[in-house]
Amino acid sequence: MTTPHLDRLRAHCQRLRLHRLEAELPNLLEQAAKREMSYSDWLDELLSLEIQSKAEKHLAMRTAMARFPFQKTLDAFDFKFQPSIDPKVIRELATGRYLESGDNVLLLGPPGVGKTHLAVALGLKACEQGIRVLFTTAAGLIATLGKAFAENRLDERLKILAQPQLLIIDEIGYIPIDRQGANLFFQLISRRYERGSILVTSNQSLGAWGEVFGDAVLATAILDRLLHHSITVNIRGDSYRLREKLKAGLLKSKHVPEPATE
């Protein structure tokens, strides 16, 4: 193919924003000639390549906007180390069907058992399914809401936090929440009630949330909305972080839980 012709095709790709095709056009033309592809087969391959490229870009954008603290997958989770977790329940959550019905998810258990890992992994799965996700810690969320309240922008911030189809709130119960923080948290839960899913992790049992929020009445109102349509996963097991410290010799113990092997 002549250079002017190739340049014209590239210009067309630029105008149509077919950036992947523009970059790979010479190779695609060469492969089409070598394989003696029909026009329809070649066009199908071109469009499939561009669709894949755009899907990858959109996934990368959704993942970046979710603000995950790290990226971990379900495949990397050691279910055999945490036998209290039913893998079928987590795999079902990974399908995203709970998002279609607007259900909430509560991951409860002591520190280090993998709650945040599961929350991030489920969030990544949701991103792969085209879902808009936002990850935040409870402390970060309360601080954000408190700042918005002080600046008279609370309603604006609540509208923003109500937009993601999945809001992940990590580490409820790790630090105490004052009365104002509890009230702001309740307003967010109420704003999202039956509008979008919330996934929370907590190291406290639900019965202790009155102490976490410093107000039993507010805690009950929050739980009433979270539990109305929800799936609760209770994790009872050893800490992954403690296991790694034991393996590294930083701690000593008579019983060191070993990771399961195939």
Language model regions located:
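Conserved P-loop
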Residues: 85-163, 212
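Solvent-exposed alpha-helical segments within well-ordered globular domains of core cellular machineries
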Residues: 7, 11-14, 23-26, 41-44, ...
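Interdomain "pre-motor" coupling segment immediately N-terminal to P-loop NTPase/helicase cores
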Residues: 10, 14, 18-70
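AAA+ P-loop ATPase motor domain of ring mechanoenzymes
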Residues: 44-97, 101, 240-252
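Conserved, well-folded catalytic cores of nucleic-acid-processing
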Residues: 12-19, 28-31, 46-49, 53, ...
